């Protein structure tokens, strides 16, 4: 949503749904249109528009608290359709290009996810490491570059039930996570059973 400063009380809106066209309407009309989002207890998040949206979205695939790979896709949502129209090939999103966790261009994001953002999320939500899904992902947009010219990132959403397709490296990461958790559970069970065996 963008306020039209030359027209009091008017806004320009663009739905993220494929094929949508920009619309101009009074703010009150827009709020009425959004009422269904609140009817079931939902909410609307005021997320600032990112001018670097045409550079694409980065999907960071996680297994537990470790990065399992990345996907980079040139998206078209929230970008006005080209002159060829919303159904033209030019208006369609690009393919998601998959990368392993060691991809050089995403190492800053990997460090943030593993060392800062995931631990902060776990602390805020009261989630321990074994409770994290063995495969989940977080989608990011590029934010403005910092003073040193490095990329910054803005979170779009977190997915825990619709993560596929996944990078080629991700199945091995999932297997490692499952193995570690099973071994920990086995060790815990063995330690708990040891006093019972000694009594016998």
Regions found by a protein language model. Name each.
Residues 126-137, 141-200:
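C-terminal active-site "lid" helix and adjoining low-complexity regulatory extension at the edge
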């Amino acid at each position: 949503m963008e306020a039209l400063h030359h027209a009091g009380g008017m806004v320009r809106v663009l739905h993220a749904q494929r094929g949508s066209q920009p619309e101009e309407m009074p703010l009150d009309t827009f709020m009425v249109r959004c009422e269904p989002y609140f009817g079931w207890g939902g909410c609307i998040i005021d997320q600032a528009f990112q001018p670097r949206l045409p550079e694409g979205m980065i999907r960071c695939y996680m297994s537990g608290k470790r990065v399992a790979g990345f996907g980079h896709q040139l998206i078209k949502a929230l970008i006005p359709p080209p002159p060829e129209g919303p159904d033209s090939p030019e208006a369609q999103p690009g393919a998601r290009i998959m990368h392993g966790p060691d991809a050089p261009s995403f190492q800053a994001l990997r460090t943030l996810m593993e060392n800062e953002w995931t631990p902060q999320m776990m602390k805020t939500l009261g989630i321990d490491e074994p409770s994290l899904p063995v495969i989940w992902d977080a989608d990011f947009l590029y934010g403005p570059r910092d003073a040193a010219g490095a990329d910054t990132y803005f979170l779009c959403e977190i997915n825990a039930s619709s993560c596929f397709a996944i990078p080629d490296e991700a199945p091995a990461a999932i297997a490692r996570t499952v193995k570690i958790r099973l071994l920990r559970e086995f060790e815990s069970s063995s330690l708990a059973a040891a006093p019972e065996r000694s009594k016998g």
